[in-house]
Design a protein with these regions (language model features):
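Nucleotide-sugar donor phosphate/pyrophosphate-binding loop at the beta->alpha transition
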Residues: 158-160, 168-189
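Conserved donor-binding/catalytic core segment of Leloir-type glycosyltransferases
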Residues: 52-54, 245-261, 267-271
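Short hydrophobic beta-strand element within catalytic cores of glycosyltransferases
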Residues: 338-341
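Aromatic "clamp/platform" in nucleotide-sugar-dependent glycosyltransferases that forms part
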Residues: 321
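Short alpha-helical donor nucleotide-sugar binding micro-motif in glycosyltransferases
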Residues: 308-313
């Protein structure tokens, strides 16, 4: 870990002068680049301390990381107005929006469900530097994460690495066990360079420690408890939409159609159980052939629409046994739904018998048994307990208060920390 106190003391007092020649091979030939750089330099001239979040895990259909970042942006605007916040992510072109989201052109990943891969660490770091950040948070170990480290060195500001995924496990899943160790080595090398490493779960913290990264701070993610609310429940509406009778038991999963989500386990388990169970897939069934007892609904961009579907089902199901955290599980709990998970990964740290049921493994037989065990209990009472737990332990306000304390510690800037209440003198 770097000595961030030394970096803070050496932070630049004036904006870093990033030239267009650092961003394009032939400067002056791209109006989008020039306009975006001017906009970033103008915003960097302000006096407020600036937090810059950057990641490639931000796509039109991406899930937890994107919702975390957008929720943080909204919370900072409401509760830390003296802090400027920019979000630097890949896009189809170059654009700096008034809401503080900066999109930098990057190529789409083949079969990547809309994700884009920036090609140049040096250029990404230059773009982030142009914002003159007080603090940078990197949300991945890829080009943006590496660029964040370069920008931190150039500007002289601390850089936080928030570990939202386990790329070594993903490499093993998609390419075989041979790919795990090389990726793990690069992952550990990068995260060892951050001034502070944050993990959303003990599961990911342990994986980082196994890879050789130390000094990890565990900070769970949160949930928008007003958006994801039991009041959105309308079971009759959903049954009519699905063409099912009142005796149906609706199990919901919402997420990307990614291999690690183990959607096949959910399908096999429901088909083993048979009537009256039905699996409702929101977004996760894209591209799949029709399956008995499985209903695929399209991806929903509006969180309120997702909340309405989840709240209107009877239980939420999640079979990823290597999930780093599982933000969608919290959202289901906030909707007042009991959850069936797997006794492994980050989900097992959120779900217990007080709010749902854990399968012994991500095996269809074990998972089917867990579903049956859940419905042998008082599912509605479990859902009410899930709502209470989500509100009391995982509301975004609590999560971001903790994070901004860390930001204040790293930067020495009081604007990140809640000001003390001034009491009137009688």
């Amino acid at each position: 870990m770097k000595k961030f106190n030394e970096k803070v003391s050496g932070m630049s007092a004036s904006p870093i002068d990033v030239q267009e020649s650092e961003l394009r091979l032939f400067p002056g030939l791209d109006d989008e680049v020039a306009a975006t750089l001017r906009a970033l330099k103008a915003s960097a001239a302000g006096e407020r301390p600036r937090l810059v979040d950057t990641t490639m895990l931000f796509a039109p259909r991406s899930g937890g990381v994107k919702r975390y970042l957008l929720s943080k942006k909204a919370w900072l605007a409401d509760h830390r107005p003296d802090v400027a916040h920019s979000l630097v992510v890949p896009g189809a072109g170059y654009k700096a929006s008034l809401d503080g989201i900066v999109r930098l052109q990057a190529a789409k990943l083949p079969f990547g469900d809309g994700y884009r891969w920036p090609s140049s660490v040096r250029r990404w770091g230059a773009w982030v530097s142009s914002l003159n950040p007080t603090l940078i948070e990197a949300g991945d170990p890829y080009t943006p994460g590496q660029g964040a480290l370069e920008a931190g060195q150039r500007v002289g500001c601390p850089v936080v690495g928030f570990c939202h995924s386990d790329p070594a496990a993903l490499a093993a899943l998609h390419f075989g066990e041979w790919a795990k160790k090389p990726v793990e080595k690069r992952w550990a090398k990068l995260f060892s360079q951050f001034d502070r490493v944050v993990s959303p779960s003990r599961f990911i913290a342990q994986r980082l420690e196994e890879a050789g990264v130390g000094g990890i701070l565990i900070r769970p993610l949160g949930v928008e408890v007003d958006t994801f609310h039991p009041d959105r429940r309308d079971r009759d509406w959903l049954l009519k939409k699905l063409g099912l009778g009142a005796d149906a038991r609706l199990l919901c999963f919402a997420g990307r159609p990614a291999k690690e989500k183990n959607v096949g386990v959910l399908i096999d388990a429901v088909q083993r159980l048979g009537a009256p169970y039905h699996l409702v897939l929101v977004g996760a069934g894209a591209g799949m052939p029709p399956e008995d007892r499985v209903i695929s609904l399209p991806y929903e961009k509006d969180p309120r629409a997702v909340a309405r579907i989840i709240a209107s089902c009877d239980a939420f199901v999640h079979a990823n046994d290597k999930e780093p955290f599982g933000l969608i599980v919290l959202e289901a709990m906030a909707c007042g739904r009991a959850v069936v998970g797997v006794n492994a990964g980050g989900v097992a740290e959120t779900v217990d018998e007080s709010v749902g049921q854990l399968a012994a493994s991500a095996d269809p037989i074990d998972y089917a048994e867990a579903i049956e065990a859940l419905f042998a209990r008082d599912v509605e009472a479990l859902g009410q307990a899930a709502r209470v737990k989500a509100v009391e332990q995982f509301a975004w306000s609590r999560v971001f208060e903790d994070l901004t304390m860390l930001y204040g510690e790293l930067t020495g800037k009081a604007e990140f920390v809640t000001p003390q209440e001034v009491l009137p003198i009688n």
